[in-house]
A protein has these predicted regions:
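Structural signature of beta-strand start/N-cap positions in the alpha/beta core
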Residues: 21-24, 36, 47
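Acidic-basic catalytic patches of nuclease active cores, encompassing PD-(D/E)XK
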Residues: 1-28
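Conserved catalytic cores of phosphodiester-cleaving nucleases, focusing on short active-site segments
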Residues: 38-59, 76
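A short beta-turn/loop motif at secondary-structure boundaries
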Residues: 31-34
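Short, low-complexity, polybasic intrinsically disordered segments
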Residues: 101-113
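Catalytic cores of nucleic-acid endonucleases
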Residues: 55-103
């Protein structure tokens, strides 16, 4: 499985997880530039939630959350600002969903990163 398919599979898992938690998926893979992509845009109650998804096969080389660098977070924030400039949104936050697939599937939801 190539990296794009692997990433999409992780995002599919994250969407199913969010939906089970009562989130409505609004958009996926919203691109604003080469460096600025929002993986999942969802709504939970009255809050729009921008979700960065990180998926790893194992945690042998570190946990998925470690891949959310300062630069990555800055790019996510830029994407959020673009989205907010196009849409009327009162309440929002940025979350991360970190998925490790082996030895068993583990999903960690980090809110307000």
């Amino acid at each position: 499985m190539d990296n794009k398919k692997f990433g999409n599979a992780g995002e599919d898992l994250a969407c199913r997880y969010l939906q089970k938690q009562g989130y409505e998926i609004l958009e996926r893979n919203k691109h604003y530039s080469r460096f600025c992509e929002l993986d999942i845009i969802a709504k939970h109650k009255n809050t729009v939630v921008f979700v960065e998804v990180k998926t790893r096969k194992t945690d042998a080389f570190g946990v998925p959350a470690e891949a959310i660098t300062k630069t990555k977070l800055e790019n996510i924030r830029k994407g959020v600002q673009f989205y907010l400039s196009e849409n009327k949104v009162k309440n929002f936050r940025i979350d991360a969903i970190c998925i490790t697939l082996k030895p068993e599937i583990k999903i960690e939801h980090l809110k307000n990163i």
